[in-house]
């Protein structure tokens, strides 16, 4: 989600001029994703407990995908804010659900490193956003749309790849009482598990 949060830095001045926003509306529009982030973080764990970590992560990936494409295609500030808010919901939810999923599926000896890699990947996303903004800047009057749309690429990749990962064995045990499948998944991810 680092890329989704940071990419806005390359488009905010253009959007202010394009839609002739006053300072208050401009600030509100730029912060809309943050409002979604708070709500997503507060409530993102609920569907993870009901649907499963994997399904929730899939929907989070789709929210990033829809948000990036929708914001890139927005023709007014209101639709832009709706799509940025949706992306913010995904950011907030992912900040809760992804570390839970990683910690529940990772073998004990690698758990710390893998949970830390989540934060490292956020920072990597921030870097990629700044670099992509740099290279996309100046590509014409729609360069701001390209900057927002580029987030769709990792979002799509994530949404596809999550389909090939197993569900959290902890979720299967605690919420589905499925000991058999939980053991199968544990044997796949941790060959040294008892």
Give, region by region, the residue ranges found by the protein language model:
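Transmembrane-helix signature of 12-pass secondary carriers
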Residues: 1-194
């Amino acid at each position: 989600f680092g890329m989704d949060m940071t990419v806005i830095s390359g488009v905010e001045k253009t959007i202010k001029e394009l839609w002739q926003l006053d300072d208050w509306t401009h600030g509100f529009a730029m912060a809309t994703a943050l409002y979604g982030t708070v709500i997503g973080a507060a409530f993102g764990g609920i569907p993870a407990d009901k649907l499963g970590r994997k399904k929730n992560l899939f929907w989070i990936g789709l929210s990033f995908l829809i948000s990036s494409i929708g914001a890139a295609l927005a023709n007014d500030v209101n639709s832009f804010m709706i799509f940025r808010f949706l992306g913010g919901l995904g950011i907030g939810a992912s900040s809760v659900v992804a570390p839970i999923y990683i910690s529940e599926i990772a073998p004990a000896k690698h758990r710390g490193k893998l949970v830390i890699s989540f934060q490292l990947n956020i920072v990597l996303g921030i870097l990629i956003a700044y670099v992509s903004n740099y290279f996309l800047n100046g590509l014409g009057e729609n360069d701001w749309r390209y900057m927002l749309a580029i987030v769709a690429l990792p979002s799509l990749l994530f949404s596809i790849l999550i389909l090939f990962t197993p569900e959290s064995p902890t979720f299967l045990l605690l919420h589905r009482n499925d000991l058999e499948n939980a053991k199968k998944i544990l044997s796949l991810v941790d060959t040294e598990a008892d």
